[in-house]
């Protein structure tokens, strides 16, 4: 059986990237929370 997770860089960026996060209010909230938490990486 084929495994379910077949990583693709393009999809990873398009779905979880910084610009994608900035494009919606909830995405901006994600970034805000990660900044407050002190994450080194804010997004993929």
UniProtKB/Swiss-Prot annotation:
Residues 1-16, 30-44 have a biased composition (Basic residues). Pfam families: Ribosomal_L34. GO terms for biological process: translation. Residues 1-44 are annotated as: Disordered. It comes from the Bacteria. The keyword Transmembrane does not apply. GO terms for molecular function: structural constituent of ribosome. GO terms for cellular component: ribonucleoprotein complex; ribosome. Keywords: Ribonucleoprotein, Ribosomal protein. Belongs to the bacterial ribosomal protein bL34 family. NCBIfam families: rpmH_bact (TIGR01030). This is Large ribosomal subunit protein bL34.
